[in-house]
Amino acid sequence: FLIGADAAKHTISEGDMLVVPSLTLCGVTTETGCIYTEIIIKKENNNMNKIIKSGEVIKLKDLISYEDGSITNIDVVSNDTMKFVLMAFDDGTGLTPHRAPGNAIIFALEGKAVIGYEGKDYTISAGENFRFDKNGLHSVTADGRFKMGLLLVLE
C-alpha cells in the first residue's frame, strides 16, 4: 500500500490490517495481485481502540489473547451504525443461538469453528468469511481454539 502524499510504502500480508486516516491519499501496487477488504467509516464520532495506530501494519489475530475456558472480545472500532469486534474462543466454547441485530460478516482469523445459521451447520477456517442477515439465528462453537473478527452493521 502507498499511503500519503509522499507515497510511503507499507507491505501487508494475509491477515494484516492497515488503518489509513480519512482524507489520506492511498493506493495499492502488487506483483501478483491481491484481494483485500476495505471498510470506510464515514461518521466522525467513531470510537477507535487506542491499540490501533494509523499507518502501522498489524495482524488482527495478535491483538487478542485466549483465556482458558472462556471467550474474550475487544472492540476495534464502533459508532452508532457499525461495530468491528475481535473474539477469541477457547476450545469447545461458543455462543448459544441468538439473532443478529444487524447484517454481519465473520472474518475467521485463526483456527476453525462451526457456525450454526438458520438450522444448518457450516465449518469456517482461518481465511474464510461468513455472512449473517439481520435477525438471522446463529451460533458459533470453537473446534479447537478460534479467533474471529465480526463486522456488524447496525441500522
Language-model segments: residues:
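Short, conserved beta-strand element in jelly-roll/cupin
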Residues: 1-2, 88-90, 99-114
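A short, compositionally biased micro-patch
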Residues: 21, 31, 79, 90, ...
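Localized chelating/binding microdomains
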Residues: 51-54, 68, 97, 105-108, ...
